[in-house]
UniProtKB/Swiss-Prot annotation:
One of its GO terms (molecular function) is tRNA binding. This is 3-hydroxyacyl-CoA dehydrogenase type-2. The modification N6-acetyllysine is found at K53, K69, K99, K105, K107, K212. The keyword Acetylation applies. Substrate binds at S155. The active site is at Y168. It is found in: Mitochondrion; Mitochondrion matrix, Mitochondrion nucleoid. InterPro entries: NAD(P)-bd_dom_sf, Sc_DH/Rdtase_CS, SDR_fam.
Length: 261
């Protein structure tokens, strides 16, 4: 029996951190392919204006991923507006560049900074996963038995963390580590879980760096020797949604880069 490849057309997708960068590009691609998108981001983001640009197929749901109350309210809003949730793309995250110990400054990494990154990137991702799984579990299964797809965002820093990335690497490594067990948890419900680990991408943060720095970073990518385009992240998201046999995987999207110390 041939497997049914699912189109994104007609699906409802929640994209956390969806107000900018590759995450906004993801929402734009999904809407362009006939899906409906819910941009979930913090209240002071550009989510409202970006959602309006995408038209009636997109709404903004203000929420902090670390808040159970706010995420549940955002998911309820999505279901009230569009009837169900088929896809969740977890992209919200923060980063700090702090050494564990800086000898010259005699400065020790604070627990507060470490906990803040873990709380947003790792616990925030799990918070969305568990709550959206509860919503997807109420969906009627498609002909292949699927009720939903959850896509998380890790980083190559999960595998080759750099100086000053202890907190960030730990948070992204946690997302990598929980992908398979959560996929196994949700398999009986018909919910797939896949994680993307991006390399160096042209995010709003990187594009503010001096051109010389951007060119150096791009030169570290074996092929193609450039920064990743947000559209390439969005393309992979669509591929994951449409391929029903992708489950429990962490996919590096990095041009074969392996970060050196």
């Amino acid at each position: 029996m041939a497997a049914a490849v699912r189109s994104v057309k007609g699906l409802v997708a929640v994209v956390t951190g969806g107000a900018s960068g590759p995450w906004l590009a993801t929402a734009k691609r999904l809407v362009g392919q006939g899906a409906t998108a819910v941009l979930l981001d913090v209240p002071d983001s550009e989510g409202e204006s970006q959602a309006k640009k995408l038209g009636e197929s997109c709404i903004f749901a203000p929420a902090n991923v670390t808040s159970e109350k706010e995420i549940q309210a955002a998911l309820t809003l999505a279901k009230e507006k569009f009837g169900r949730i088929d896809v969740a793309v977890n992209c919200a995250g923060i980063a700090v560049a702090i050494k564990t110990y800086h000898q010259k400054k005699n400065k020790i990494h604070t627990l507060e900074d470490f906990q803040r990154v873990i709380n947003v990137n790792l616990i925030g991702t799990f918070n969305v996963i568990r709550l959206v799984a509860g919503e997807m579990g109420q969906n009627e299964p498609d002909q292949g038995g699927q009720r939903g797809v959850i896509i998380n965002t890790a980083s190559v820093a999960a595998f080759e963390g750099q100086v000053g990335q202890a907190a960030y690497s730990a948070s992204k490594g946690g997302i990598d580590g929980m992908t398979l067990p959560i996929a196994r948890d949700l398999a009986p419900t018909g919910i797939r879980v896949v994680t993307i680990a991006p390399g160096l991408f042209a995010t709003p943060l990187l594009t503010t760096l001096p051109e010389k720095v951007r060119n150096f970073l791009a030169s570290q990518v074996p092929f193609p020797s450039r920064l990743g385009d947000p559209a390439e992240y969005a393309h992979l998201v669509q591929t994951i949604i449409e391929n029903p046999f992708l489950n429990g995987e962490v996919i590096r999207l990095d041009g074969a880069i392996r970060m050196q110390p």
